[in-house]
């Protein structure tokens, strides 16, 4: 008999082990990582001063958000907030061997209604379209409504192709 809990050994043996971890999206919330990656994750957690490995993974995802968006077309952070968030500063760390440098980069958080995406502020302006889309529309309308010559058609098509990329 376990005097601390008031349960005898036979009751302990009959109890079925339950997975105490929740499932998220039908998947177990625990993740498997290769043995070669685990020490790196543990070391990074310690060096960044986080209490859990989950905080480190969250930090990694936040800092990789622009690259994830570029690869998938959407971000990874979900939110219930329907408003566009104001500009924020997110910490960014550069890890190079044994040295970590801490920088703060301004970021813009954009909410698309069901997902929140984080972009560095520089990417919001550096990659903005340099062409007025009404000009492209006007070129298209004049070209394909029969109001343009053959040379105008070639010029408008070339302009459209180069400015919409």
UniProtKB/Swiss-Prot annotation:
GO terms for molecular function: DNA-binding transcription factor activity; transcription cis-regulatory region binding. GO terms for cellular component: nucleus. It is found in: Nucleus. Mostly in anther in young buds. Residues 1-21, 146-165 are annotated as: Disordered. InterPro entries: TF_TCP_subgr (IPR017887), Transcription_factor_TCP (IPR005333). Residues 17-71 form the TCP domain. Residues 1-11 have a biased composition (Polar residues). Residues 148-165 have a biased composition (Low complexity). Keywords: Developmental protein, DNA-binding, Nucleus, Transcription, Transcription regulation. The keyword Nucleus applies. Residues 12-21 have a biased composition (Basic residues). Required during early processes in pollen development. This is Transcription factor TCP16. It comes from Arabidopsis thaliana. The lineage of its organism: Eukaryota, Viridiplantae, Streptophyta, Embryophyta, Tracheophyta.
